[in-house]
Amino acid sequence: MSNIHEHKILILDFGSQYTQLIARRIREIGVYCELWAWDVTEAQIREFAPNGIVLAGGPESVTEDNSPRAPEYVFDAGVPVLGICYGMQTMSEQLGGKVIQGVGEREFGYAQVEVLTDSALLRHIEDGISDAGKPVLDVWMSHGDKVSAIPEGFVAVAKTETCPFAVMANEDKKFYGVQFHPEVTHTRQGKRMLEHFVMDICGCDNKWQPASIIEDAVERIKAQVGDDEVILGLSGGVDSSVTAMLLHRAIGERLTCVFVDNGLLRLNEAKQVLEMFGDHFGLNIVHVDAENRFLEALKGENDPEAKRKIIGRVFVEIFDEEASKCVNAKWLAQGTIYPDVIESAGSATGKAHVIKSHHNVGGLPDDMELGLVEPLRELFKDEVRKIGLELGLPYDMLYRHPFPGPGLGVRVLGEVKKEYCDLLRRADAIFIEELHRADLYNKVSQAFTVFLPVRSVGVMGDGRKYDWVVSLRAVETIDFMTAHWAHLPYDFLGRVSNRIINEVDGISRVVYDISGKPPATIEWE
């Protein structure tokens, strides 16, 4: 078996919103990489032994005292270094160059970079030719400060009209700096530049592939758990589903999946999960029908945060009860993925700044005394999906729109009742079915229906009816940090509204949410 971690890149994070994107692009190239905070120690870098180092961007100014710096060892480690935006500026400053604050000459957005001289980083890459006959690149800039003098041993490789050192290089030491962001799609040839750095300059092979990742994960699970039994909370979501499939491949019958039906799932979702994992794939599943228990606990509660906590608490209680029945289980599996690890500062270095605590299963009791198995903890979400496909999970399940952990508990506004959930399930199923039929489902990033606890007068035949209101919500987004409401065709919305009102007895009005994020959030609660 080839060692998928043999070749690896270290990315040092200075706080840019794009840093995780760099890691994802390098992984897409087929090379393993890890993301660490900028204040990592020399010993930690030596232990990781990267083939190359990327200094990522950041929001601060190199010209200010106490702004972050790369560890000096980065430039003494004997491996290639690529500085991106702030990373280029701190590289320049630390190696004897000069950085000045941009006054009235900030570059944000598209820019054209003219290549001045040959470099291993940009070789054979161009988007056009300048009037002077030089290669031109279309890139994405986002900087105020700029390098005004490059360090000794470096040459200016490319420039823009306002930035004389858009790319700099020391080919002997294999140090490179780019003022733009090659990791974003707006830089048209950005992925090729990263390929040049990772494959050609750092000498990495593309060993990081779905089939190899699965093989490695299976072997690691076997080595970790030995002959022991493992339990897993299976929700039917992407992460827990792929975790279940990896564990099943590794240890077979020694995996017990606990599927808790909280009564807050989508239409027929529990049935589909049980049929797919139990009947089709042959996993050992304990099915707990806990709808009444969850609804009883939620009775009378209107506050969204309180509802989330109740749902999490009841899940933990039930899971704990079921886990205690698995007397031979020594391990608890979780679908923790790499962004969770980064956010929780749970990486091997312990150096990432804590953003939020992450509890994949809602914070399981400390006294469970089970070891933790997290086979996805090195993977980004897009990698988890690719592995799921390789393991035989259906595309539609892996690429389904996001669904909140508390489920319909936060899509029924206010108090959660069975009647409301049943109406919402049917209305939402119609909306999603019509999106698929109109080939719109994959053109929006997320779509769902919200139940509003208000009644509205309607007319049905010769009579009046006084029934509930639902809102349709569809958004377009790249990262879910910001989002635009989706401009779905009027005739499509009309068709969905007519179907819901005619087919779901109890709903008299359908509205469409046209709020962006910000100021609104994507979910209503």
UniProtKB/Swiss-Prot annotation:
Pathway: Purine metabolism; GMP biosynthesis; GMP from XMP (L-Gln route): step 1/1
Positions annotated to bind ATP: S235, G236, G237, V238, D239, S240, S241
EC number: 6.3.5.2
Limits of the GMPS ATP-PPase domain: 208-400
SUPFAM superfamilies registered for this protein in UniProt: Adenine nucleotide alpha hydrolases-like, Class I glutamine amidotransferase-like, GMP synthetase C-terminal dimerisation domain
GO MF, any single term: GMP synthase activity
Statement: the UniProt record of this protein carries the keyword ATP-binding: yes
Reaction catalysis annotation: XMP + L-glutamine + ATP + H2O = GMP + L-glutamate + AMP + diphosphate + 2 H(+)
Active-site annotation: C85 (nucleophile), H181, E183
Keyword tags: ATP-binding, Glutamine amidotransferase, GMP biosynthesis, Ligase, Nucleotide-binding, Purine biosynthesis
InterPro entries per UniProt: Class_I_gatase-like, GATASE, GMP_synth_C, GMP_synth_GATase, GMP_synthase, GMPS_ATP_PPase_dom, NAD/GMP_synthase, Rossmann-like_a/b/a_fold
EC top class, as a word: ligase
Sequence ranges assigned to domain Glutamine amidotransferase type-1 in this UniProt record: 8-207
GO CC entries: cytosol
Keyword match Ion transport: no
Function statement: Catalyzes the synthesis of GMP from XMP.
Listed name of the protein: GMP synthase [glutamine-hydrolyzing]
